Amino acid sequence: MVMKKLEEIADVFSGVQVSRFVDPKGEKTPIIKNKFTDSYSLDYYYENISNRINEKYYSKKGDIIISLSQPNTVSIIHEDGFIIPMYFAVIRVNEMYDPSFIYHLISSKDFHKKLHIFCEGGALRVIKVAALKSIKLNIPNLEKQKQYGEFFNLIDKKNMLIDLKKDYNDKIKEYLIQTQIKGE
């Protein structure tokens, strides 16, 4: 394993100020919101956007985004073509590293403890992209990264299914209670 700064393994930059590129004649484009619908997916909205926007601000599969304000929510992008706004940092992992593994490292409590040290501000604490770039990560070889990344993804899928099962069980319970109240 080797300690590397985040900037050594990925391009790290902030998103774009979307309001500068809103154009009524532009193409309807999905823009990521700073709110997440649940712990497994991003929320987004559509806006007419000019074609002058730099391609780097469009998501690519495997991009990792982190909210620059607390709680510094982290997500991995599964689709190309979303505009990433300025309140996110984009971590575009280099080819020699596994995006899934890096995503799980950045989602960890240990990483968030390191991140907390660099947060600035009073009521609204934010992280600067320059500080984010300087955070060091312990990185194994690519083969191990891929193995760990796949394993962590399976754990996430299992947790998602457990949550889904709980939601369905709660709905069944509520339905049965309602039918009993109505006397059916």
Regions found by a protein language model. Give the residues of each.
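Glycine- and charge-enriched low-complexity intrinsically disordered segments
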Residues: 100-122
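Sequence-specific dsDNA recognition surfaces
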Residues: 5-20, 34-61
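A short beta-sheet element
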Residues: 67-106
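Short, surface-exposed loop/turn microsegments at beta-strand edges and helix-strand junctions
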Residues: 22-29, 56-59, 76-87
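Non-catalytic DNA-recognition/assembly elements of restriction-modification systems
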Residues: 1-28, 37, 138-184
